[in-house]
């Protein structure tokens, strides 16, 4: 990441994007420079207009969350949520009563742990 920052600094200072300039900026920042990475960065950015790339990145909108339906559908569903919640609670209460018929659990745990 620091290599990209070095390229942005050089671009902002209207300096030429060369291996020597990248190395100089990174060394001034106390970074151990890998010559191959500096060379690769210069080659990768050779045909890139950095100003344009920065503007495009800044103008890109954030992804919006997906809509679940139209406003008409949402208005029609408003009253149903409470009924569905009540039905779910009733089903859970019935399931809770069924646990009395079962034997205490834990007897088969010895098989799991040897």
From Swiss-Prot:
A Pfam family annotated for this UniProt entry: Ribosomal_60s
Bias-annotated ranges (Acidic residues): 70-105
Keywords on record: Ribonucleoprotein, Ribosomal protein
Gene Ontology molecular function: structural constituent of ribosome
Lineage top rank: taxon: Archaea
Compositional bias annotation for Low complexity: 56-69
Residue span of region Disordered: 55-114
GO-annotated cellular components: ribonucleoprotein complex; ribosome
Known function: Forms part of the ribosomal stalk, playing a central role in the interaction of the ribosome with GTP-bound translation factors.
Family named by the database record: Belongs to the eukaryotic ribosomal protein P1/P2 family.
Subunit structure: Part of the 50S ribosomal subunit. Homodimer, it forms part of the ribosomal stalk which helps the ribosome interact with GTP-bound translation factors. Forms a heptameric uL10/P0(P1)2(P1)2(P1)2 complex, where uL10/P0 forms an elongated spine to which the P1 dimers bind in a sequential fashion.
UniProt protein name: Large ribosomal subunit protein P1
Native source organism of the sequence: Halobacterium salinarum (strain ATCC 700922 / JCM 11081 / NRC-1)
Gene: rpl12
């Amino acid at each position: 990441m620091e290599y990209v920052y070095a390229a942005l600094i050089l671009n902002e200072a209207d300096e030429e994007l060369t291996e020597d300039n990248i190395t100089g900026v990174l060394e001034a920042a106390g970074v151990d420079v890998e010559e191959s990475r500096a060379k690769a960065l210069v080659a990768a950015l050779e045909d890139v207009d950095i100003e344009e790339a920065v503007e495009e990145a800044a103008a890109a909108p954030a992804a919006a969350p997906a809509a679940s339906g139209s406003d008409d559908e949402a208005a029609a569903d408003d009253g149903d949520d409470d009924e569905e919640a009540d039905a779910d609670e009733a089903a859970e209460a019935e399931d809770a009563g069924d646990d009395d018929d079962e034997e205490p659990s834990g007897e088969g745990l010895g098989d799991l742990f040897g």
